[in-house]
Swiss-Prot record:
Belongs to the UPF0391 family. The chain crosses the membrane at residues 4-24, 30-50. It comes from Rhodopseudomonas palustris (strain BisB5). Pfam families: DUF1328. It is a multi-pass membrane protein. GO terms for cellular component: plasma membrane. This is UPF0391 membrane protein RPD_3366.
Amino acid sequence: MLSWVVTFLVVALIAGILGFGGIAGASIEIAKVIFFIAVVLFLISAVVGLARGRTRV
């Protein structure tokens, strides 16, 4: 249990450093780009799957 506490403490400290630094704005833009790429890839794979006759998405 103590290892989980230490792990979350480290993650929280890194998030705090990145959030209060100037990197947060750049991270948001990168996350937006990755999100839209993932949505486009999902839609392409769904259309290709439906075109092949598979019903699972």
